[in-house]
């Protein structure tokens, strides 16, 4: 039904499109529309239940893929950035912290330079006004070899694998292999993984790096 379609879309938006930022600006033309033509031939979904959950799961997967592609297609972008925050006190805090991180111009510039600057991540978390304990927070950068900005599915990476570098542990900066960090962060898709110990909630957000081309593109035309 129209009511359940609207409910599903609003639920999906919270963990997909609302977790995307290219440059922090929202166009007045940004629009999201969902329509159903009835051609699937299934029984109309009029309430929550197994069929609704199946539809919602499929919708979330589709919207997640599209949200990542929006971030990957940012003006002048060379790198897709996914930020995962785990161990937050609630889902809202986890998502908000992740989005604060990927929205930071300094973090975005560091991602362009493949610079493992965890201080900028902590700075963004700090000025967010959100509740977290930096003394029990840890940070990794991870990636997959030969990763691309454009893909159909993007799972969180194992944080202790070949393409992972931990830079901050329980409030203490770590000595780390700078060459490895550069390699990890030079891939086209990079994950910032933040582990808190404030609860059991997780959230994520997607963004991109801030490049010279972004400034050129937006400095060369009038909107």
Model-identified regions with their sequence ranges:
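A structural signal for small-residue-enriched, beta-sheet-centric alpha/beta enzyme cores
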Residues: 1-223
């Amino acid at each position: 039904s129209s009511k359940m379609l609207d409910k599903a879309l609003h639920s999906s938006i919270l963990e997909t499109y609302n977790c995307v930022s290219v440059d922090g600006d929202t166009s007045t033309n940004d629009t999201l529309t969902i329509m159903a033509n009835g051609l699937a031939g299934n029984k109309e979904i009029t309430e929550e239940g197994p069929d609704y959950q199946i539809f919602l799961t499929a919708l979330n997967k589709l919207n997640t893929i599209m949200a990542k592609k929006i971030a990957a297609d940012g003006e002048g972008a060379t790198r897709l950035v996914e930020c995962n925050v785990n161990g937050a006190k609630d889902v809202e805090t986890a998502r908000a912290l992740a989005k604060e991180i990927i929205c930071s111009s300094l973090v975005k510039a560091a991602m362009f330079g493949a610079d493992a600057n965890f201080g900028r991540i902590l700075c963004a978390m700090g000025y967010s006004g959100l509740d977290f304990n930096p003394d029990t927070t840890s940070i990794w950068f991870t990636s997959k070899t030969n990763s691309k900005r454009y893909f159909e599915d993007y799972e969180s990476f194992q944080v202790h694998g070949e393409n992972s570098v931990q830079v901050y542990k329980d409030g203490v900066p770590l000595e780390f292999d700078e060459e490895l960090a550069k390699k990890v962060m030079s891939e086209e898709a990079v994950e910032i993984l933040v582990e808190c110990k404030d609860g059991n909630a997780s959230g994520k957000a997607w963004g991109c790096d801030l490049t010279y081309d972004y400034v050129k593109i937006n400095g060369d035309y009038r909107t």
